């Protein structure tokens, strides 16, 4: 018996309200998976921006506050970044810290799909970390499988 491999891509829009903000994308990606053609496979989620990162964690408010505080302390905004220096860079956003934070977190995720739904642990959620907002953002969701 031959199994047909399907692939379906879609864009997901996201509007953020703060410079540093964590957004739970799980319900929106789950809806795309449930309405998509793939029953078993993988969902690839990719940020289309260098200052919007993706990660998996739980959505407990205090924990998300801790993550934001940790990122801000680990990679401070005012540090004399070369990317923020007009003599060295043509970037007018002065957002080097956001690029460095995103580099630490990553820009893509691979989540298993089984029986037409995402496979996540009890407390796991797909989270977007806005690191240079507020902005209008795009994510690409690619479903691959059968």
Regions found by a protein language model. Give the residues of each.
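Active-site histidine-anchored catalytic micro-motif
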Residues: 1-146
């Amino acid at each position: 018996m031959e199994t047909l491999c399907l692939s379906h891509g879609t864009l997901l829009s996201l509007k953020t309200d703060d410079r540093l903000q964590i957004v739970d994308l799980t319900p929106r990606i789950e809806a795309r998976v449930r309405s998509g053609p793939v029953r078993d496979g993988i969902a690839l989620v990719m940020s289309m921006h260098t200052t919007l990162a993706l990660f998996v964690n739980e959505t407990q408010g205090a924990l998300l506050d801790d993550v934001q505080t940790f990122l801000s302390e680990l990679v401070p905004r005012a540090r004399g970044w070369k990317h923020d220096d007009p003599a060295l860079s043509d970037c007018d956003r002065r957002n080097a810290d956001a690029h460095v934070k995103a580099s630490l977190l990553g820009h893509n995720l691979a989540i298993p799909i089984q029986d037409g739904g995402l496979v996540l642990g009890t407390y796991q959620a797909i989270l977007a970390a806005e690191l240079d907002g507020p902005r209008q953002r795009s994510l690409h969701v690619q479903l691959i499988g059968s």
